[in-house]
Amino acid sequence: MQHNRVDILGTPVSSLTMDELFNDWEVVIQQGQKAQVCITPVNSILAARATARVQEIYKNADYVLCDGVPVKWASEFLRDPIKERITGLDVLPRIFPFAVAGGFTIFLLGATPGVAETLKEVMEAKHPGVQIVGTFVPPFRVVFSKEENQQMIDAINAVKPDLLLVSLTAPKQDIWIAENLAKLDTHVAIGIGGAFEVAAGMINRAPVWMQTAGLEWFYRFLQEPKRMFKRYFVEAPVFIPLIIQQKFSKRSGRP
């Protein structure tokens, strides 16, 4: 579906509201189409800037969502404001009632052992009638073997889900979807990041005031300091000067 995009360091970030997004997905499913959805925080945008393959995936993806206040702020600084910040943590809880209302089926792929099953149980209790038709946890590897990859494809295709939720961390999940979507019997494939654990109640989300103030990253760091240190204190500080450079390069006409 067509929508406006905003260039953030070479990544075309989608500018649309949550309602517009779900309306689009309903059409995609009903018309038997396919769509790749990438949820892109700052570290994914930086990964795309550094890696041509990742940037190509984001340019070809159907939706590249604004996951994080810094990305929204950057669009405003560049005077091309994105309509709405749409994070994986906001999208995931809305998917289940959306699926119930439309009679759509869901498959959960990824996360650590036990997480997807817990999420399935929690959502089946919370949303009677939700059809979570399968879960699969692949081994923890940088690159899957051909056999492992085929097992994942076979598990998904056996149940033909309308919505495929992939939790392999970004940009790994986005690469996997891009490389395999043509082989998958599904319609909307979403790289959802670490949202499974939060939606399942295994990890708490930041208070609303911290989300609004752009401090959700700090709350996540306090919960998982070892895993998040590089993302927030090594990679993220590079983002601001690059955005400033992009703005003034545009002004001067430099590429």
Task: Please identify what each model-predicted range represents.
Residues 85-86, 93, 133, 183-195:
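Short, acidic/small-residue loops that bind anionic groups at enzyme active sites
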Residues 153-170, 186:
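Proline-aspartate-enriched helix->loop->beta-strand connector
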Residues 76-160:
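Conserved beta-alpha
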